[in-house]
Amino acid sequence: MPRKTPIERYRNIGISAHIDAGKTTTTERILFYTGVNHKLGEVHDGAATMDWMEQEQERGITITSAATTAFWKGMANNYPEHRINIIDTPGHVDFTIEVERSMRVLDGACMVYDAVGGVQPQSETVWRQANKYSVPRIAFVNKMDRVGADFFRVRTQIADRLKGNAVPIQIPVGAEDHFKGVVDLVKMRAIVWDDDSQGVRFEYTDIPPELVATAKEWHDKMVEAAAEASEELLERYLSGEPLSEEEIKTGLRKRTVAGEIVPMLCGSAFKNKGVQAMLDAVIDYLPSPVDVPAILGHTEDDKEAERHPSDDEPFSALAFKIMTDPFVGQLIFFRVYSGVVNSGDTVYNPVKGKRERLGRILQMHANVRNEIKEVRAGDIAAAVGLKEATTGDTLCDPDKVIILERMSFPEPVISQAVEPKTKADQEKMGIALNRLAQEDPSFRVATDEESGQTIISGMGELHLEILVDRMKREFGVEASVGKPQVAYRETIKGKARDVEGKFIKQSGGRGQYGHVVLDVEPMPQGGGYEFVDAIKGGVVPREFIPAVDKGIRETLETGVLAGYPVVDVKATLVFGSYHDVDSNENAFRMAGSMAFKEGMRRAKPVLLEPMMAVEVETPEEFTGNVMGDLSSRRGMVHGMEDIAGGGGKIVRAEVPLATMFGYSTSLRSLTQGRATFTMEFKHYAEAPANVAEAVINARKVG
C-alpha cells in the first residue's frame, strides 16, 4: 500500500506546558480545526477528548499522554495536506516521566505558556527535557484574554529564565477583554478571527494604526533573526535589500530546526483565536522526521549503527509507552524511525532477546481507535499483542538488529506500604500493581523482606495517590496506604585503602576460599558505581573477578548505616589470593561483599536525603508566614519575586522531602487556602548529623 502522506509532510509534535496553561484546551482546538472533532471539549466540564482517564476528568489535569493524529492544509487551505501526530503531555511535576518519554520520540514541540503566569516551575523542567533530547520548539502564549495578560513579559521570561532565544513572529492586537487577534509579522497584516464560526473563518486586515510602530520594530528583529540563517541572506539583509516572505520563513525554519531560535506566537485557545495560525507555524517551522538527525543505536556486537527515516531502511521503532486498555488489553505505543511493518509481522526486541508477533496495529485519536494494516517511518501507533515489550525497548527487523538508545528514568523519591482492604484481594493487588509498574517506569513495586509488606515508590504524593486510585477503578482493588517513607541513600566521604575480605570455610572435603583486597573511594554526585580491576600477575584468577563485582553490587543494595542503597562509590580490586581446589565464584562473591562492607565502614559513610525544589505562590500578606514555615522545615529560601501581573509573591526554596509530607494541608491553613505550591526532586544532599542519627536509630528499632 503506497504512503498517503510523504514523510516530509509529517510533523511529530508534543504540546507541553505548566499545569493550567491551557494545553489540553489548545489540543482540543487543534482537533476541532483539523476537522477531526466536531464538538469542542472543554476541560472545565470534564469532556476534553485528550483527557480520557476518569481521574483526569475529575482533577482537570492531564495525566497520560494520549497520541493523536490530525491532518492540516493550512488556515487558508494554502498547504498540501500535512499529517500532524500530537502527543499530549501532562503538566504536573509528579508526571515528569510522561513528558520525558514523549520528548524522546518527538521531532518538535509546542510550548504553551499562560500569558499571565508566564514561565512557571514545570515550564523550566519541560524546557530542560526538550534540551536534553535537542527538540526544536515554538512557543504559544495562550490565555491572551485573561486579566493581566502580557505577551512581551513572557518573552523576557523565556530569555531570562530559560535562556531561550524567543523571536516573536506575531504580536497581539489588544489584550485581556480587548484581545482581538494578532499581527502576522511575516506578512505584516493583522489577522482577526470570526467568533460566530468559532474561529474557523478569519480575515486579514490592516495593522491598527497604534500598533504600526511596534509591529515594524518586531518585524525588523524577526527578519534579522531569519537572515542569520545563511551568509547570503545576511549579506542581502545588511545591504538593505528586503527579504521575501518565503526567504524569511526559510531562514526562520532553518534556525528553529537547528535549535537556535524559538518562534513565538500568541492567542486564546478558549476564545478560538490563534490556534489555527499556530498549526500553520508547526508546518512552517517545526521539523519533519527527515529534518532531524538519523536515529543512533548499536548492533548486538556493540558496533555503532544508525537508521534513516525512510521506508526502504530496515524496520526500527521505540516503544515509549504502555497502557492497559479495558477493551483490547495491553497497548504498546511506539514510534517508527525507519522501514515499514504490517500487522501480523514478527518483530525482534533486542533488549529482551525475544521475537514477537505484532497483532493489531491501532492509530489513536485520543481514546477513539482506528485499526490500520501497516505503519511506516515517522508514524506513531499502538500495538496489541506484544507481551514482552516495556517502555524504552527497541522493536526491529529480526534480520537487521539495532538497539536504539534507551530512555533514562528518574529514581523514585517517596515510598509507601500498601495492603488490600481484604485478604482475598492480595493476588489481585499484585497483578494490578505489576500492570501499573509496567506502564510507568518511575513507579516501582517491591516487597519488604523483613516485614513482608508491599512497598510502592514514586515521584511524589500525588503520583502514588493517583496510582492507588487507578487500582481501585481499573482493577477493583481497594487498598489502604501507610505513611509515606523517604527514599534515603548512603554514600562515603572518605577513602579506605587495602581493605581485606576473606571468606574461608575448610572443614574436610571441598572447602571455600576467597580472598580480596579493595580500595574504596567516593565518586562525584550522580557518578553511580564503578568497579575497577587492577589485579596484576593473576593473584585473583580472571574467572573469579566478575564474582567480586557481583558481591559488591549485592552489598550496594543495603548500606552499613541504615540499610539504604549505596550510591556514588568506586571499588578497585588491587590484590587477593586463591586456593587451587577450594576457590570458587561464590567464595569470591562473599569475599568481595565482606571487603566492601568493611571499606564502607572505614570510609566515613554518610546518609543522603532527597532535597526538593519548592515554589510557593502566595498573597503578599502571608509571605512572612510561608518563609518562616519553610525555614522551620529545614528549608533554604533561595529567592522571592512578584507574581507576574501582581497579586502576590513567588517564594523559591530547597527543602528536604522528609519535612514536606502533608505540606498542602499546612499551607492551606497558613494562607486561608489562597496559596499554591509545586515541588519537584532536585538532588540528594548529606543529611545533618541529628537527622541522620534519628533515621538510623529508627531503622534499628524498626
UniProtKB/Swiss-Prot annotation:
The keyword Cytoplasm applies. PROSITE patterns: G_TR_1, G_TR_2. CDD domains: EF-G, EFG_III, EFG_mtEFG1_IV, EFG_mtEFG_C, EFG_mtEFG_II. Residues 8-290 form the tr-type G domain. GO terms for biological process: ribosome disassembly. One of its GO terms (molecular function) is GTPase activity. SUPFAM superfamilies: EF-G C-terminal domain-like (SSF54980), P-loop containing nucleoside triphosphate hydrolases (SSF52540), Ribosomal protein S5 domain 2-like (SSF54211), Translation proteins (SSF50447). Transmembrane segments: none annotated. InterPro entries: EFG_II (IPR041095), EFG_III (IPR009022), EFG_III/V (IPR035647), EFG_IV (IPR047872), EFG_V (IPR035649), EFG_V-like (IPR000640), EFTu-like_2 (IPR004161), G_TR_CS (IPR031157). Keywords: Cytoplasm, Elongation factor, GTP-binding, Nucleotide-binding, Plasmid, Protein biosynthesis. It is found in: Cytoplasm. PANTHER family: RIBOSOME-RELEASING FACTOR 2, MITOCHONDRIAL (PTHR43261:SF1), TRANSLATION ELONGATION FACTOR G-RELATED (PTHR43261). Belongs to the TRAFAC class translation factor GTPase superfamily. Classic translation factor GTPase family. EF-G/EF-2 subfamily. NCBIfam families: EF-G, PRK12740.1-5, small_GTP. This is Elongation factor G 2. It comes from Cupriavidus metallidurans (strain ATCC 43123 / DSM 2839 / NBRC 102507 / CH34) (Ralstonia metallidurans). The gene is fusA2.
